[in-house]
Amino acid sequence: MKIHYLLFAFILVMLSPLAAFSQLINSPVTCMSYGGSCQRSCNGGFRLGGHCGHPKIRCCRRK
């Protein structure tokens, strides 16, 4: 039974740094500071970089 606690602690420690690197852009200020613009859809030479505070408004950055 003790091995389960050790295994859980090991997995928790190994996965905790990944949460910091998986966050997307979440505000218009952050989007613009990364060189993006807030639009309804990312077309052409733009790619999705996150959202601008609302799920339907996307932060689009050049590819």
UniProtKB/Swiss-Prot annotation:
Predominantly expressed in skeletal muscle, also expressed in esophagus, tongue, and trachea. Also expressed in lung when induced by lipopolysaccharide. Pfam families: Defensin_beta. Residues 1-22 form the signal peptide. Its main location: secreted. The modification Pyrrolidone carboxylic acid is found at Q23. One of its GO terms (cellular component) is extracellular region. GO terms for biological process: defense response to Gram-negative bacterium. Coiled coil: none annotated. Keywords: Antibiotic, Antimicrobial, Defensin, Disulfide bond, Pyrrolidone carboxylic acid, Secreted, Signal. Induction: Expressed constitutively and induced by lipopolysaccharide (LPS). It is found in: Secreted. Disulfide bonds join C31-C59, C38-C52, C42-C60. Belongs to the beta-defensin family. Has potent antibacterial activity against E.coli (ATCC 25922). This is Beta-defensin 6.
